[in-house]
Design a protein with these regions (language model features):
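ANL superfamily adenylate-forming
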Residues: 25-72, 99, 194
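Gly/Ser/Thr-rich phosphate-binding loop
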Residues: 83, 152, 177-182, 192-234
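Conserved pre-ATP/AMP-binding loop-to-beta segment of ANL
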Residues: 62-80, 87, 117, 121-130
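Conserved AMP-binding/adenylation subdomain of ANL enzymes
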Residues: 99-130, 138-178, 193
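Conserved AMP-binding A3 loop
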Residues: 76-105, 112
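Active-site charged/polar residues at nucleotide-handling catalytic sites that mediate phosphoryl
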Residues: 14-16, 174-175
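Conserved AMP-binding
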Residues: 1, 134-139
Length: 234
């Protein structure tokens, strides 16, 4: 979360959240606010914070979670808007709408495998899929298209702290990243960084997806010219 303490306080209160999961930076921002909410601390000392327990303790084997009947139309998550004109607004999504994401991506993958390039090549699903998550997990792209889809398919995730195209192509080469999804400007950044750093091997990257804005035609042409075997999603 990029929220500061006041915004975290608002979101927790507005959503009527029952537990807060955060790292050292987020827990520091929340100190002195909504002290009654239980906190699960990640990668930090739980004893340093109010009403906090370590993540490692929470996930220790214990009693099985109770089975809960879930209807496809039940509420599943609340994503908050940017709040550019006031307090952020909570956008509720259902289980059905979230599950539709991996279903849609599976359909797109199946369609892609049946297409041929001008050179007669066909798209082959990588044996060891790996995705570069360079967008926030509090956004549907990071949460659903990156995290959830990877959870369903067993895809490895490489996380970036913040966007840096030069660092991105370094990670793509190092971890043999096979897919990337972000806004079109990020895809353009990758293409430009790869041109400026030709020593980087990006041959593992076979899918360059994106959304949030229309992909410029010149970007598609540049990708087809420089990386003809890679799929450009819109």
């Amino acid at each position: 979360s990029w929220w500061q303490g006041k915004e975290l306080d608002y979101g927790i209160t507005h959503s009527e959240a029952k537990v807060f999961i955060g790292d050292d930076e987020r827990l520091q921002r929340l100190e002195g606010l909504v002290e009654d909410i239980p906190r699960i601390s990640v990668r930090c000392d739980a004893s340093a914070y109010t009403n906090s327990v370590a993540f490692e303790e929470v996930v220790e084997p214990n009693e099985a979670f109770p089975l809960v009947e879930i209807d496809p139309e039940d509420d599943a998550s609340i994503m908050y808007t940017s709040g550019s004109t006031g307090y952020p607004k909570g956008v509720v999504t259902t289980h059905r709408s979230i599950i539709n994401t991996p279903v849609a991506w599976a359909f797109l993958g199946s369609m892609a495998s049946q297409l041929e390039t001008d050179g007669g090549e066909t798209f082959v699903q990588p044996e060891s899929p790996c995705t570069l998550a360079a967008v926030p997990l509090f956004h549907v792209t990071g949460s659903h298209s990156n995290f959830l889809l990877s959870l369903v398919t067993g895809t490895r995730i490489v996380l970036m702290y913040k966007w840096d195209p030069v660092k991105a192509i370094e990670l793509i080469e190092k971890y043999k990243v096979t897919s990337f999804s972000g806004v079109p400007t990020m895809a353009q950044d990758i293409l430009k960084a790869s041109e400026d750093n030709p020593e980087r091997d990006l041959s593992s990257l076979v899918s360059l997806g994106g959304g949030g804005a229309a992909r410029p035609p010149e970007q598609i042409k540049a990708q087809e010219k420089n990386h003809p075997s890679k799929i450009a999603g819109v």
